[in-house]
Design a protein with these regions (language model features):
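Hydrophobic beta-strand signal
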Residues: 71-73, 86
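Short, Lys/Arg- and Gly-enriched loop/turn segments at beta-strand edges
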Residues: 78-86, 94-95
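PDZ-domain C-terminal substructure recognizer with occasional recognition of PDZ-binding tails
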Residues: 96-118
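Short proline/glycine-enriched turn/loop segments at secondary-structure junctions
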Residues: 118-125
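Well-ordered beta-strand positions enriched in small/hydrophobic/aromatic, beta-favoring residues
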Residues: 53, 85-87, 107
Length: 140
């Protein structure tokens, strides 16, 4: 016999939980975690994530990432082919699948109504990878 209280006990350790900043918009030239970019904080108990990005729009709906969702990002400057990443394009952050095709980098949406953004590997001044998407927070 098991007490029903086992389902309601908090077994997490406070020391493993960190508060991750939620970024609504990221401006070019400003450090990612600059105070003006932060719209709040979200507790998270996985040490891999460094910040969160609030999603605006429907470009990733086929990956089940919807408008208003929050994506947890591990800050890193590279990703593997086909991974979902937070990318700074010109002066705004976006979430896309990153593909390396021949001498190009393609940022693809998960919604067929959006065309891929294509950049030459030799001229990547217009974008940079901010980090890899590792988790999703969504409301029903």
């Amino acid at each position: 016999n098991v007490s029903p209280n086992i389902f309601f006990e908090d077994t997490s350790s406070e020391e493993n939980i960190k508060r991750l900043p939620i970024l609504g918009k990221i401006a070019a030239g400003i450090p990612i975690l600059a105070q003006e970019n932060i719209e709040g904080y979200l507790p998270y108990d996985d040490n891999d994530a460094d910040f969160c990005l609030r999603i605006h729009g429907d470009s990733m709906i086929n990956a089940r990432i919807n408008d208003g969702d929050i994506v947890f990002i591990k800050q890193q400057s590279t990703v593997e082919n086909g991974e979902i990443a937070a990318v700074l394009v010109n002066d705004s952050a976006t979430l896309k699948r990153v593909y390396f095709v021949d001498d190009t980098v393609q940022l693809r949406s998960e919604n067929p109504k959006y065309k891929p953004m294509v950049f030459s590997k030799n001229n990547c001044d217009n974008f940079r990878i901010l980090g890899k998407a590792i988790a999703l927070y969504t409301k029903f």
